[in-house]
């Protein structure tokens, strides 16, 4: 021991000391010197290496260390990072399924498209191009056209068949249109005859229709309906309107046309509307009192 010198231990005040050491993913050293000054990371690393400070290095994944640290605070938890094995494709692909059986064992004709009636002729041969097939009269659809015509024909007299019933309907429409452009007659003798002698029932329908039309025209001219069909009751009685009715609109001056004047001597009021003239005449007869202006004292 005599001449051996003991290793010199640096003074506590002169040597810097470490206050904390932590790492997460990469090392970081926080060093304070004797003057309580912070060192930058580069100087701190050099100081740590010079004093041979052992670093806590780990070759494991930092995330696994964090999970292990969190498991300590959660009782009964078992969080592990493990790669799940790849599932085989047989589990991902759908399995084979049996064909869905229909509700009906024997499907109807509308289910099987091969049994549908052909709306248009086939074009395989030239002879079948011009052939028209009536799908309304087919057996599958029950013959809708023939049944409707037979139902109408059953309600007609025995002497009229289905074809004559269709002719009567078209003739009635023609007669109704002719009534719209001609004046109503008292009897059906002056109506142009468009029916044959065999259609006796059609003649009775035409005669009843003409009587209803003539009765409607007679009631409308009398003005007994809800709305008057004639404007004779609203005709103006002013002198200008009397002249136009007597001599015609071309016989009087153009300035008097459409103008209604008062016939009271000394008045001379002129209005563009007959309703205004009638209101003025009520003032002459005393039915309507004259409104006084605010400035008039009398």
UniProtKB/Swiss-Prot annotation:
Tissue: Expressed in ASJ sensory neurons, pharyngeal cells, rectal cells, intestine, seam cells, and vulval cells.
Molecular function, one GO term: zinc ion binding
PROSITE patterns: ZINC_FINGER_C2H2_1, ZINC_FINGER_C2H2_2
One Gene Ontology biological process: positive regulation of gene expression
Protein name: Specificity protein transcription factor 1
Region (Disordered): 206-233
Family the entry assigns: Belongs to the Sp1 C2H2-type zinc-finger protein family.
Protein origin, superkingdom: Eukaryota
Knockout consequences: RNAi-mediated knockdown abolishes expression of sulfotransferase ssu-1 and thioredoxin trx-1 in the ASJ sensory neurons, in adults, embryos and larvae.
Gene3D superfamilies referenced in this protein's UniProt entry, alphabetically: Classic Zinc Finger (3.30.160.60)
Membrane-spanning intervals of the chain: none
Provenance organism: Caenorhabditis elegans
Role, per record: Probable transcription factor which modulates gene expression, thereby acting as an ASJ sensory neuron terminal selector gene.
